[in-house]
From Swiss-Prot:
Protein name from the UniProt record: Iron-sulfur cluster insertion protein ErpA
Any one GO biological process: iron-sulfur cluster assembly
Cited PROSITE patterns: HESB
Pfam families: Fe-S_biosyn
Oligomer and partners: Homodimer.
Cofactor info, note text: Binds 1 iron-sulfur cluster per subunit.
Keywords: Iron, Iron-sulfur, Metal-binding
PANTHER family to which the protein is assigned, alphabetical: IRON-SULFUR CLUSTER ASSEMBLY 2 HOMOLOG, MITOCHONDRIAL
């Protein structure tokens, strides 16, 4: 049986930051959840939250012992994308590099398909 490709990449930088945040919270059950909501200046926006549970149908991507969780509705907009963590002049944040987005806003937090 062939291995199935993971439809979303969870970078080492993002996983390491999640690991640090989980350690600070002292709750090993936490997982980073990425989701899509309507809104933002381009129609859809990315959201990130910590969640202790997973739901039926959630995709779980593991890296360095930490988990990224995505619900099925959000996943359809994120397939082929990458969840990363960056630190720069604008501050530090989790970002999504999404090949499905036809346009993105200047700050990168919203997009359209």
């Amino acid at each position: 049986m062939a291995d199935l490709a993971v439809p979303l990449t969870f970078t080492d930088a993002a996983a390491n930051k999640v690991k640090t945040l989980i350690s600070e919270e002292e709750n090993t059950e936490l997982k980073l959840r990425v989701y899509i909501t309507g809104g933002g200046c381009s129609g859809f926006q990315y959201g990130f939250t910590f969640d202790e549970k997973t739901n039926d149908g959630d995709l779980i991507v593991e890296n360095s012992g930490v988990k990224l969780v995505v619900d099925p509705m959000s996943l359809q907009y994120l397939v082929g994308g990458t969840v990363d963590y960056t630190e720069g002049l604008e501050g530090s944040r989790f970002i999504v590099n999404n090949p499905n987005a036809s346009t993105t806003c200047g700050c990168g937090s919203s997009f359209s398909i």
